[in-house]
UniProtKB/Swiss-Prot annotation:
It comes from Caenorhabditis elegans. Its EC number is 3.7.1.2. Highly expressed in the intestine and the hypodermis. The lineage of its organism: Eukaryota, Metazoa, Ecdysozoa, Nematoda, Chromadorea. Its cofactor is Ca(2+); Mg(2+). This is Fumarylacetoacetase. Ca(2+) binds at D127, E200, E202, D235.
Length: 418
């Protein structure tokens, strides 16, 4: 399938993708829901009346909102109908937009003229710890090889509740956090800027569909109906603050200062060709977490760092999302097994995605092995992030000549306020 809209070679956004986002322009500061196609954005508010199928005819107003929450809250058949209609309208064989110059001029906006915003109002944010390679590496560093994985790790998707208010969209700079740290040889903690600033290469999915009532669970057979779409996520971390504060309740200030997400939400339907077999799980998890259908995604991921004053990004790690041990379905089913209600717009992070080799580690903590190794970044070296470093995450699926991308997830570290 091809679009009448020109799609540059190696674009993240061919007609097979069609991710959703929220944008504004200098000419119109109002926020609108859009779909990326090539280097353009299709403004869905301008074509809302064209969604006239059985699922969406009575819900055209969802495309005129300033966030995706109302659309996300519709059931999955509505998402499928919207995607099919947008593909039809953008296809080279459909005259509705192609031959209507006036409508086309209103509905298509150059991405270069747009400012992207968070795609949804995020009510709650949960971060999992689903990479066995990352969990093993961190366990070896802090507890030794014999106790790398905690006893519960292979029985359930470990997670914690994060801070939704400090989630920001790609391109937002962040200040180095300050807090308490304690050096190994110090008798008391000290206060000041974190010296061990880190990124975490993650992906996250937005919850959609009608809310499950408090006290009811989402069975794993129905979990896909609640997974709206996927974004890149950088779970910025202050490792020295984390090391001092995390016992016994887990991360707090070391994580809550900022989390960056990419602006374009790639639907599960767009990613369907890239599902691969799930990892072997030993021991076999409890029945409520068991599913045989492939729901592991083959997404090539990379992290680059651009030091201040440098003109280019330098890749420091390459890995793949398929290395995760726990699937998205398992994460969602586990989250609700106690009766927790999930709402449209909630965000669930994967945890750091690391592969089995050193170059596939998804954090500076692992790449530098807790500061014991130097990581080349162009002509410079790093053990952790310095002020002025700009970090970018990228993700691409490729199969049968079709490339599906996620855009950028970029943020720059600014000096701390002391």
């Amino acid at each position: 399938m091809k679009s009448f809209v020109s799609v540059p070679q190696n674009s993240d956004f061919p007609i097979q993708n069609l991710p959703y986002g929220v944008f504004s322009t200098k000419a119109d500061s109002s926020r609108h829901i859009g779909v990326a196609i090539g280097d353009q954005i299709l403004n869905l508010a301008e074509i809302a009346n064209l969604f006239d199928g059985p699922q969406l005819k009575a819900h055209q107003d969802v495309f005129k909102q300033s966030t995706l929450n109302a659309f996300m809250a519709l059931p999955r058949p509505a998402w499928l109908e919207a995607r099919a209609r947008i593909q039809q309208l953008l296809s080279e064989d459909c005259a509705v937009l192609r031959d209507n110059a006036h409508l086309r001029s209103r509905a298509l906006v150059a991405q270069s003229d747009a400012t992207m915003h968070l795609p949804a109002q995020i009510g709650d944010y949960t971060d999992f710890y689903s990479s066995i390679h990352h969990a093993t590496n961190v366990g070896i560093m802090f507890r030794g090889k014999e106790n790398a994985l905690m006893p519960n790790w292979k029985w359930l998707p470990v997670g914690y509740h994060g801070r939704a208010s400090s989630i920001v969209v790609s391109g937002t700079d962040l200040k180095r956090p300050v807090g308490q740290t304690k050096a190994p040889d110090a008798e008391v903690p000290s206060f000041g800027p974190s010296k061990l600033m880190d990124f975490e290469l993650e992906m996250a999915f937005f919850v959609g569909g009608p809310e499950n009532e408090l006290g009811t669970r989402v069975p794993i057979e129905k979990a896909e109906d609640r997974i709206f779409g996927v974004v890149l996520m950088n779970d910025w971390s202050a490792r020295d603050i984390q090391a001092w504060e995390y016992v016994p309740l887990g991360p707090f200030l070391a994580k809550s200062f900022a989390t960056t997400v990419s602006p374009w939400v790639v639907s599960i339907e767009a990613l369907r060709p890239y599902f691969v077999e799930n990892p072997v799980q030993d021991p076999v998890p409890p029945a409520y977490l068991h599913h045989d259908d492939p729901f592991t995604l083959d997404i090539n991921l990379a992290v680059s760092i651009r030091p201040e004053g440098d003109a280019v990004d330098h890749i420091v790690c390459k890995t793949n999302f398929k290395h995760l041990y726990w699937t998205l379905k398992q994460q969602l089913a586990h989250h609700t097994v106690n009766g927790c209600n999930l709402r449209a717009g909630d965000l669930l992070g994967s945890g750091t995605v690391s592969g089995p080799e050193e170059g596939a580690y998804g954090s500076m903590l692992e790449l530098s092995w807790r500061g014991a190794k130097e990581v080349p970044v162009g002509s410079e070296i790093r053990k952790f992030l310095k002020d002025g470093d700009e970090v970018n995450l990228s993700g691409v699926c490729e199969k049968n000549g079709v490339r599906i991308g996620f855009g950028e997830c970029r943020g720059k570290v600014l000096p701390a306020d002391i």
